[in-house]
Every structure is written in C-alpha cells, then in structure tokens.
C-alpha cells in the first residue's frame, strides 16, 4: 500500500496495471538481532549519532503534511520530501519531467557524478473514494524511472540508494510545495536501511506541530527528549503487520461515550501523510451520532461529511482512541474538538468538512492525532511510542 495525504483528506491507495512493486529494487534486509557473538572491538562498527531535520508544514487552512529536505547526488542537490509513514519508497520530481512538474524543484541527474540510471519505468495511480478533492479515474498518477544515487539526511549519507525519478505527473500534484515523498514504513528501506547498516539505531521520531506552533522536526536514529514532558508510552505492532505502522485498538470513544459499534476491536494504521481520519462507514456514522445529528454526508464528494460552518466550531467532538501499552495498561490517544473542522468544501463554502471520512476496508489516523503527541517509530522493536505535547 502506498498511502499519503493529498489536499484535505485523501489517503491514496496505489492501484496500477504496472505496479511500483514490479519496478522496486529488492529491499535491503536488516538483521535486527545481528550481534549475538561478541565482536572484537576493532571490528565493531562505529555507531552513527541521531540527527534532527526541521520540517515545514504544508498548510491550506488546516495542517496537511510535514516535509523536509534531503540531499541527492554528487554534488548534493536539495530535494524536499514528505516523510510519509504510509509508504516505503523515495520518489521526487526530476528534469526528465517537463512542464507537468514546473511547480516543483526538479532534480537534475545529469549533474550528479554518482547517479546510476536503472532505467525501469513504471507508473503509479492513486485511488480512493474520499476527499475534499476526490480522486476520479487516474487524476493522481505518477510516471517513474528507477535509479540509484547518494542520499543524505541531516548530514548522514547513504550511497547507492534506490529511488524513483518522477518523469511525468498529473496536474493534481502541481500544488505540492515539495518535490517528492520519502516513505518511512515499518520495514526500513532506502537511506534509512543503509544508515541502520552503518550503525544508526533503527528508529525515528516525529514532532509534527500545528503551523501556528512551528518548529516541527524529525529525528532519525533517536528521540529528542527536549520536546515533551512526561514519559513515552509504547505499544507493540501486531504480529505480521509487515511494513505497515498499525496498532490494535479495542475501542473508540466520542465525547466520553461508546456504543456497540465503537466497542469493536480494530487495527488502526498510522499514516503521517494523511491528516483526516478514516473509518468504515458504520463506524463513522456511529461517531458522528455522538457529535451532532446535523453532520451529514456531503454527497458531492463520496466518503466526506459536513455541517454548516457557523455551527461547527462550538461542537464538542473529543475522540479517544483506546490502545494497550506493552505493559498491558490501557491508554488513549485523544483528538481534541479543535480538529473537527477541516475547512469549507470547494463546491459549497458555507458547509465545512468534518474530520472523519467513511472508508470501508480500513481504519487510519494521521496528522490530526500525531500533532498532539511526540511519536517514536521504533522499527527495530516493532513498536510505537507516544508522549503528550
Ligand atoms: C530546505 O532547503 C531550502 C534551501 O534549499 C530552504 O529554503 C528551506 O527552508 C529548507 N526547508 C526546511 C524545512 O528546512
Ligand atoms: C560512500 O561513497 C563515498 C565516495 O565513493 C565513500 O568515500 C564512502 O566511504 C562511502 N560510504 C559508505 C558508507 O560506503
Ligand atoms: C549499488 O547497488 C546495486 C543494487 O543493489 C548493486 O548491484 C551495485 O553493485 C551497487 N554499487 C555499488 C558501487 O556498491
Ligand atoms: C504526461 O501526462 C499527461 C497526462 O497526465 C499526458 O497528457 C502527457 O502526454 C504526458 N507527457 C509525457 C511527456 O508523457
Ligand atoms: C515541560 O514543563 C515545563 C514546566 O511546566 C514547561 O515550562 C515546558 O514548556 C514543558 N516542555 C514541553 C516540551 O512541553
Ligand atoms: C479513555 O477515554 C475514555 C473516554 O473519555 C475514558 O472513559 C477512559 O477512562 C480513558 N482511558 C484511559 C486509560 O485514560
């Protein structure tokens, strides 16, 4: 699955005749418990220290996505990417892309002495039934060419990293203030896998603040303990969750109440690239029933709901998502009422879209939860940690 945030609420699921998987380089295997026998000190790899990179907020009336700089090539060219826990590969606009990518900074592979053209072409099409700007047909489609080059993040360098150059894209991508996407899935790949092999601890942390607060950041290989008070609560990924960041939740609460529909156990995906939250239709309806009868589906854009903008800001809409910590203790991640309003619909600006989208088949949360916590994404221990901020 390739899933990230577009505009106000899309979770993009890749469907493609010629899928990215076909073109993808074989992921590097990371041996997480590799050091069993003692190794002579002289052979011990030198640990890499964690690095922190600042993130900017793609804000369109609401916080959408957070992106930062990496460098690619020799000499290095700066490429801005969304660090997306909902996907796993690196792709960015290149000079092979013509006018379609003119709003993005383009990487010029001819200026990099370390660039290797692998030359496999593929395309990836994104589809979902929901969104303020709904996906229709193939209106979110990237054309890609596989390659390898040096990639650096915060000064840590990974040679010969698999990546994809965007050679064409549909117009919907034109508004992005960044050039690409760096997947940060629960199985380390690309630059992150290389850095782990070089001795970097196999975790990263996100501090995704609202635009008004600023100073958002990602720490690769560590935890920035200056960004929260109190302690981190860790929960384990379910066995077999593969590369998806997912936690089991036994129950949802809205405004302190629960119902039989909300008491169901479900696995919830954590996608830093998506800002709205997605639940199956019956769950979304049960949640809205505890907020206001005036919130109704916005039929022009399937999966979305809305209410008159002048009613929305006074509605209590506290969502508690229950989880179980590694020690067996229950804890909640809480979305405050202030997240309910994600802004006016384009086709009717008097109606404001509400946070929860109906999406049958999965449950997914993103930025609207993550910006209220410091989050730790522990690949090596297959767990996630949260501390309130
Ligand atoms: C990314 O680098 C550009 C300069 O190339 C700089 O203007 C911008 O502020 C940087 N963005 C972040 C989030 O650090
Ligand atoms: C990466 O490549 C550079 C230049 O070829 C080399 O100096 C460096 O040692 C390489 N780094 C690693 C970790 O292999
Ligand atoms: C770069 O990676 C490719 C694919 O993994 C490998 O075949 C090639 O030998 C590597 N090149 C160098 C210089 O390490
Ligand atoms: C890029 O894609 C658009 C469709 O989105 C298509 O019309 C156009 O011909 C493509 N350009 C190239 C150079 O392939
Ligand atoms: C931690 O608590 C202190 C004292 O209340 C406060 O001044 C500080 O801003 C807090 N730091 C964070 C990162 O929340
Ligand atoms: C989670 O939230 C619900 C609803 O507000 C509350 O009843 C429950 O006590 C909370 N659980 C924890 C562990 O705080």
Language-model regions: role of each:
Residues 70-72, 79-84, 90-92, 181-182, ...:
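Short hydrophobic beta-strand that contains or immediately precedes a catalytic carboxylate
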Residues 82, 92-96, 101-104, 174-177, ...:
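Short, solvent-exposed loop/turn and secondary-structure capping segments
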Residues 222, 266-315:
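Extracytoplasmic, non-cytosolic globular domains
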Residues 96-124, 196, 236-238, 285-302:
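Cytochrome P450 catalytic domain signature, combining two hallmark sequence patches
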Residues 22-35, 168, 318-389:
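Aspartic protease catalytic domain
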């Amino acid at each position: 699955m390739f899933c990230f945030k577009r505009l106000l609420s899309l979770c993009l699921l890749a469907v493609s005749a010629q899928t990215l998987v076909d073109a993808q380089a074989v992921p590097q295997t990371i041996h997480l418990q590799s050091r069993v026998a003692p190794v002579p000190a002289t052979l011990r790899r030198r640990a890499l220290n964690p690095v922190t990179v600042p993130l900017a907020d793609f804000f369109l009336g609401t916080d959408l996505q957070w992106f930062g700089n990496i460098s690619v090539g020799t000499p290095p060219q700066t490429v801005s990417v969304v660090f997306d826990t909902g996907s796993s590969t690196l792709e960015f606009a290149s000079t092979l892309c013509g006018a379609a990518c003119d709003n993005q900074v383009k990487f010029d592979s001819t200026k990099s002495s370390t660039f290797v053209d692998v030359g496999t072409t593929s395309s990836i099409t994104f589809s979902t039934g929901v969104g303020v700007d709904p996906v229709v047909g193939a209106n979110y489609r990237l054309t890609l060419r596989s390659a390898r080059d040096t990639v650096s993040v915060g000064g840590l360098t990974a040679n010969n990293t698999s990546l994809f150059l965007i050679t064409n894209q549909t117009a919907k991508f034109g508004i992005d203030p960044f050039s690409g996407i760096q997947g940060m899935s629960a199985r380390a790949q690309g630059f992150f896998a290389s850095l782990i092999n070089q001795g970097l601890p196999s975790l990263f942390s996100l501090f995704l603040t609202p635009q008004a607060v600023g100073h958002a950041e990602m720490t690769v290989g560590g935890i920035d303990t200056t960004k929260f008070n109190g302690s981190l609560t860790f929960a384990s990924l379910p066995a077999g969750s593969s590369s998806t960041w997912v936690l089991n939740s036994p129950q949802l609460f809205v405004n302190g109440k629960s119902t039989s529909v909300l008491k169901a156990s479900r696995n919830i995906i954590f996608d830093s690239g998506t800002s709205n939250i997605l639940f199956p239709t019956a769950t979304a309806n049960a949640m809205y029933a505890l907020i206001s009868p005036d919130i109704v589906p916005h039929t022009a854009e399937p999966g979305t709901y809305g209410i008159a903008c002048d009613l929305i800001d006074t509605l209590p809409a506290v969502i508690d998502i229950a989880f179980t910590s590694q020690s067996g203790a229950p804890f909640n991640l809480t979305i405050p009422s202030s997240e309910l309003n994600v802004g006016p619909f384009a086709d009717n600006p008097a109606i404001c879209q509400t946070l929860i989208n109906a999406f049958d088949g999965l449950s997914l949360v993103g930025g609207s939860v993550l910006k209220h916590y410091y989050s730790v994404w522990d690949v090596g221990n297959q767990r996630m940690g949260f501390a309130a901020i």
